[in-house]
Structure formats: structure tokens, C-alpha cells
Design a protein with these regions (language model features):
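An amphipathic, aromatic/His-enriched active-site/gating alpha helix that lines ligand/cofactor pockets
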Residues: 24, 30-33, 58-90
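Short, well-ordered beta-strand segments in beta-rich or mixed alpha/beta enzyme
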Residues: 2-8, 40-70
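Compositionally biased, intrinsically disordered low-complexity regions
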Residues: 7, 12-13, 29, 95
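Glycine-rich beta-strand-turn "strand-cap" elements at beta-sheet edges
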Residues: 39-51, 77-95
Length: 95
């Protein structure tokens, strides 16, 4: 399945500077059984009604509970949650 995390950071956040440390956190999730890949995509738009960052994870559906409880996921939330104005989480099966 695909797990999407789409993030809009708080106005004034230099979110482009956060790419490397956020990527480092999410790359650690690759050690969780059933997580196959992680991609980070930065927005190419500065429009205020656009989201800033998209994280795309390819995983087995059964890996989602382990991911939710994992140290990288909890660290992502504790270190960056205060910088997030809004986010969308979307899961889907691949065709």
C-alpha cells in the first residue's frame, strides 16, 4: 500500500531547510519489516494555499501499526509536530 503524509508548515517556517533532517528520520523506518521505500517530495510552489512537503511510503498494510509505534514516527511527531499547521494522511492500495 501507499501511505501519504502531506504537510503544510506554519507560516514563516524555513521548511526547505528541514528536508535533510526529516529525510533522515523517515529513512530509519526502512528497518521496520514491511516498509519498502520512502520518498520525500518538496512543493515547487510558494502559493499560500499549497502544501509544502509530501512523504510517500510504500509498505505492507500489516506494517502500519508497527510504523505508528516506531521511534522514527514518534520523533517526527515530537520534533516537527509544532511546526505543522495542517496535514493530510492518506492510505491506498496499489492497483
Amino acid at each position: 500500500m501507499k501511505h501519504y503524509i502531506i504537510v503544510k508548515f506554519v507560516e514563516g517556517t524555513d521548511w526547505r531547510a528541514l528536508e535533510k533532517p526529516i529525510r533522515g528520520i523517515f529513512e530509519q523506518t526502512l528497518s521496520i519489516p514491511g516498509i519498502h521505500s520512502v520518498e520525500l517530495r518538496l512543493s515547487n510552489s510558494d502559493r499560500p494555499n499549497r502544501y509544502d512537503l509530501m512523504i510517500v511510503m510504500d509498505m505492507d498494510k500489516e506494517a502500519l501499526p508497527a510504523y505508528d509505534l516506531s521511534e522514527p514516527h514518534l520523533r517526527w511527531k515530537s520534533e516537527y509536530g509544532g511546526l505543522v499547521a495542517k496535514k493530510a494522511i492518506f492510505d491506498c492500495d496499489e492497483d
